[in-house]
């Protein structure tokens, strides 16, 4: 089970301003606004990332997913699950179906991360019932909770597609913990037992939906890729549970179920990583395999090598005209290389803005929790609950609530400005049909929106320092000496001039070429 930590309203407001200022300094102080936000050491304020080790015994992905006997290596499937060469259909689109797959051995990881790629497809606008990702002490091969057993000891992340309580809050992603003694509340979609949740539509997407679930330092974080783009790293924040206590050893699993309505629940991959905190020694690799297994693997390798050689000979005999011919267009031209470099620079700016937007989402979610806790406290005081010595007065609570609401409004305005900037950057990345003037106008709009974001953050900082409490934030880290503001502005101007000159040169060449036709 998990217990969420509640901090005081004053500490919450102070931590919000500190985190907001530090995130903006990281955004401005990165290498040309294009540093990889996920790379260790990309900014001075960013913590060192943990060491990741891939665990193949707790993972699967296609192709060649199943063996000749229809089983998945290191995994056990039950119910109506159907393994195939490139995916596992956990539950087919038939009524009242259940299926699940579980690891055969228990994992003993202190910190871990799983990346799951799946599809949920159906004919109707409403689907049922949903899919669940598990980490439990024992396998739940069959049961009423999305195809798995009830009263589990561990945590389940539910992708619930059917609205049982009629509140029109589905599809939703719900994190539910259990200590092995609680029955799941089906009628209310687990709302009374949810530790965290978010509303995301994961049905009938053009690309597979991806979920990244991280358990690190007793904090469970769920990130979602909605499947609108082919970008595998386009994750957004969904839910976070702090002080999450789970079994030290457990099985990973996936289950799904259908009811009166039915969807196809397909899992394309399940990748597990063991995380090691910085400074600790990474886990030692397993011992060498036995001689018998080595001989077996060597025989399989030789067999596959012979088949590959035969396929090569057959292809060469069937396509003799392709032998010895050099491939065309191997090397890119100078113009293509320059255009590619411009697009890569714009893409880095786009990714940096998305990273800042993701951080603002997490801060906004935390502030909503603070406002909710303060509202409950005010309601209890209004009902006549006697106060305790040392607690703040009603007027102070009202002031803090008003401040929090104003902060939420400011953050929403900043998010809207960031979305507009991302839209303009996306327009710049496809300038094939636009002229020089339109391209220049896009650059000016992007610059204007970035100034708006900076001004909003400065106003929030000044407002916080003008209050009576005057919260003290940590000193901002020094900007890197490798690149100053003047150099950065000169670089942007030179890049813009070169890009406009290239577009004008290309337009003149095309106009000159048209004279011959």
UniProtKB/Swiss-Prot annotation:
GO terms for cellular component: COPII-coated ER to Golgi transport vesicle; endoplasmic reticulum; endoplasmic reticulum membrane; endoplasmic reticulum-Golgi intermediate compartment; endoplasmic reticulum-Golgi intermediate compartment membrane; glutamatergic synapse; Golgi apparatus; Golgi membrane. It is a single-pass type I membrane protein; Single-pass membrane protein. It is found in: Endoplasmic reticulum-Golgi intermediate compartment membrane; Golgi apparatus membrane; Endoplasmic reticulum membrane. Residues 1-30 form the signal peptide. Residues 52-275 form the L-type lectin-like domain. Residues 31-484 are lumenal. Keywords: Disulfide bond, Endoplasmic reticulum, ER-Golgi transport, Golgi apparatus, Lectin, Membrane, Metal-binding, Phosphoprotein, Protein transport, Signal, Transmembrane, Transmembrane helix, Transport. A carbohydrate binds at residues 96, 129, 164, 186, 259-261. GO terms for biological process: endoplasmic reticulum organization; endoplasmic reticulum to Golgi vesicle-mediated transport; Golgi organization; positive regulation of organelle organization; protein transport. InterPro entries: ConA-like_dom_sf, Intracellular_Lectin-GPT, Lectin_leg. A motif (ER export motif) lies at residues 516-517. Residues 278-297 have a biased composition (Basic and acidic residues). GO terms for molecular function: calcium ion binding; D-mannose binding; identical protein binding; metal ion binding. The modification Phosphoserine is found at residue 433. It comes from the Eukaryota. The record marks 508 as: Required for ER export. Residues 506-517 are annotated as: Mediates interaction with RAB3GAP1, RAB3GAP2 and UBXN6. Ca(2+) 2 binds at residues 163, 165, 169-170, 189. It holds the Pfam family Lectin_leg-like. Disulfide bonds join 198-238. Mannose-specific lectin. May recognize sugar residues of glycoproteins, glycolipids, or glycosylphosphatidyl inositol anchors and may be involved in the sorting or recycling of proteins, lipids, or both. The LMAN1-MCFD2 complex forms a specific cargo receptor for the ER-to-Golgi transport of selected proteins. The FF ER export motif at the C-terminus is not sufficient to support endoplasmic reticulum exit, and needs assistance of Gln-508 for proper recognition of COPII coat components. Exists both as a covalent disulfide-linked homohexamer, and a complex of three disulfide-linked dimers non-covalently kept together. Interacts with MCFD2. May interact with TMEM115. Interacts with RAB3GAP1 and RAB3GAP2. Interacts with UBXN6. Interacts with SERPINA1/alpha1-antitrypsin. Interacts with BET1. This is Protein ERGIC-53. It comes from Rattus norvegicus. The lineage of its organism: Eukaryota, Metazoa, Chordata, Craniata, Vertebrata.
């Amino acid at each position: 089970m998990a217990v969420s930590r509640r901090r005081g309203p004053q500490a919450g407001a102070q931590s919000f301003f500190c985190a907001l200022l530090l995130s903006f300094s990281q955004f401005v102080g990165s290498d040309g606004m294009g540093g990889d936000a996920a790379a260790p050491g990309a900014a001075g304020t960013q913590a060192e990332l943990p060491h990741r080790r891939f665990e193949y015994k707790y993972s699967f992905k296609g192709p060649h997913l199943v063996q000749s006997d229809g089983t998945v290596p290191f995994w056990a499937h039950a119910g109506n699950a159907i393994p195939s060469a490139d995916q596992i259909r956990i539950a087919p689109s038939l009524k009242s179906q259940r299926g699940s797959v579980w690891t055969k051995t228990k994992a003993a990881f202190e910190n871990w991360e799983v990346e799951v790629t799946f599809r949920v497809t159906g004919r109707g606008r409403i689907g049922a019932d949903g899919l669940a990702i598990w980490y439990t002490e024992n396998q739940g091969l069959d049961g009423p909770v999305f195809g798995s057993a009830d009263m589990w000891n561990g945590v389940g992340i539910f992708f619930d597609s059917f609205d049982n309580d009629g509140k029109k809050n589905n599809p939703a992603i719900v994190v539910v913990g259990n200590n092995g003694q609680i029955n799941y509340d089906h009628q209310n979609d687990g709302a009374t037992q949810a530790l965290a949740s978010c509303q995301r539509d994961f049905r009938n997407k053009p690309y597979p939906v991806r979920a990244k679930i991280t358990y690190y330092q007793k904090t469970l974080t769920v990130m979602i890729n909605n499947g609108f783009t082919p970008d595998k790293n386009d994750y957004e924040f969904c839910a976070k549970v702090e002080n999450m206590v789970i079994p030290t050893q457990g099985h990973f699993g996936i289950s799904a179920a259908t009811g009166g309505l039915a969807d196809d629940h397909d899992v394309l991959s399940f990748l597990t990583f063991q995380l090691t905190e910085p400074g600790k020694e990474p886990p030692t690799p397993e011992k060498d395999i036995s001689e018998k297994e080595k001989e077996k693997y060597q025989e399989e390798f030789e067999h596959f090598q012979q088949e590959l050689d035969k396929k090569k000979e057959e292809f060469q005999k069937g396509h003799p005209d392709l032998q010895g011919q050099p491939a065309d267009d191997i090397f890119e031209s100078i113009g293509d290389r320059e255009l590619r470099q411009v697009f890569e620079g714009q893409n880095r700016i786009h990714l940096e803005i998305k990273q800042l937007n993701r951080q603002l989402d997490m801060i906004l979610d935390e502030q909503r929790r603070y406002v909710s806790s303060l509202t409950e406290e005010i309601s209890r005081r209004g009902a006549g609950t006697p106060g305790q010595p040392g607690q703040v007065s009603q007027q102070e609570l009202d002031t803090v609530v008003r401040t929090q609401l104003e902060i939420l409004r400011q953050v929403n305005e900043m998010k809207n400005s960031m979305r507009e900037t991302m839209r303009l950057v996306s327009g710049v990345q496809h300038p094939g049909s636009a002229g020089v003037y339109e391209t220049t106008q896009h650059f000016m709009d992007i610059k204007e929106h970035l100034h708006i974001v900076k001004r909003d953050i400065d106003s929030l900082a000044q407002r916080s320092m003008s209050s009576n409490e005057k919260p003290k934030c940590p000193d901002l880290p020094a900007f890197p000496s490798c690149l100053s503001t003047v150099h950065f502005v000169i670089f942007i101007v030179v890049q813009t001039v070169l890009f406009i000159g290239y577009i004008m040169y290309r337009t003149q060449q095309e106009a000159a070429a048209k004279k011959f036709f």
